[in-house]
Regions:
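Electropositive, gly/pro-rich neighborhoods at or near active sites that engage anionic ligands
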Residues: 1-146, 277
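Structural signal for conserved beta-strand scaffold positions within catalytic alpha/beta enzyme cores
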Residues: 19, 72, 150-153, 207
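Surface-exposed alpha-helical segments enriched in charged/polar residues
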Residues: 59, 167-170, 194
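A structural signal for short coil/turn segments at secondary-structure junctions
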Residues: 65, 173-176, 200
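Residue-level detector of flexible, active-site-proximal loop/helix-junction positions
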Residues: 77, 156, 212
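C-terminal functional extensions of proteins
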Residues: 184, 188-278
Length: 278
């Protein structure tokens, strides 16, 4: 089974599992001293606290847990740097970085079918589900039928709000031993999943990253090479009937156009600067 099928099976059978994506932003934050004051494509700043958290999270999740998958960035040189952090590289469970992201190459074959099945399985799970994401992903709560949603800022939340987010999650989980926590909250998600795994070793923790951006906000935040109609039709069988209710959701689309995917072009970034008064 590939990683999509593994996660689907684990969720169906309530087997503890996690998936965390380590991309170029996480790499630069963790390893590049010259980038210690830099930022990723979402203008999420690299900080020492985040750097230390990412390094610890990678070590812990790959060496101390049994069913934790690491979304592997496409550049093998970056993955070699991560491998250099640990003693036993054979314990690293590398997986497809785009496990939750629908690629243009997925359309028309079983890859798309399997990914929609994964989302369907999450949606149908009766585990208590909590999402951590920015407020424009409000529709994600309907997509996966989560019990709670915790909103964080679009970027730069980790240093000041990490402990607060952990406490909020603990409050919502209550006495449950096996929660499902879904993250779409940038680089800090990796550290969040690590700490939650320590607290709830029976839990299921899934790092969606930018995967839900397009279908939930109509904003192609990463340059997916397909249209909104394409992704909407792919998800249509599991979407609620009011998915396009403008009264309920109409305000999020314009805001998403200048707050998400701002690295894709100067026009979007200029709209963003105008919005914040700079």
């Amino acid at each position: 089974m590939d990683i999509v099928e593994v996660l689907t099976d684990n969720i169906k059978n309530k087997i503890p599992v996690s998936f965390s994506k380590y991309g170029d932003g996480e790499y630069f934050c963790a390893f590049s001293e010259e980038n210690v004051n830099g930022e990723n494509c979402d203008r999420d700043r690299y900080t020492n606290k985040l750097k230390n958290g990412l390094i610890h999270a990678f070590k812990y999740m790959t060496q101390e847990t049994e069913n934790s998958y690491i979304g592997m960035w496409w550049d093998p040189n970056k993955n070699e740097s991560w491998k250099g952090l640990v003693e036993n590289t054979e314990r690293i469970k590398w997986a497809n970085y785009h496990t939750f992201i629908v690629d243009v190459a997925d359309f028309g074959n079983d890859d798309l079918t399997n990914k929609i099945e994964l989302y369907t399985t999450i949606q149908e799970s009766n585990l208590k589900k909590i999402i951590v994401c920015n407020p424009l992903l409000v529709k994600l709560q309907d997509l996966v039928k989560s019990d709670y949603m915790i909103n964080i800022p679009f970027n730069n939340w980790f240093d000041e709000k990490f402990e607060e987010v952990i406490e909020s999650i603990k409050t919502y989980i209550g006495e449950e031993e096996q929660p499902m926590v879904i993250t779409s909250c940038g680089m800090g998600a990796k550290v969040l999943i690590c700490e939650l795994t320590k607290l709830y070793p029976k839990g299921i923790f899934l790092d969606f990253g930018s995967a839900p951006d397009f279908v939930c906000t109509k904003r192609d935040s990463r340059g997916r090479l397909y249209t909104y109609d394409d992704i909407y039709n792919a998800f249509l069988p599991i979407l609620p009937s009011d998915w396009h209710d403008d009264v309920k959701y109409g305000n999020i689309y314009k805001e998403a156009s200048y707050k998400m995917g701002i690295h894709l072009g100067d026009h979007a970034y200029n709209l963003y600067l105008h919005h914040i008064g700079k």
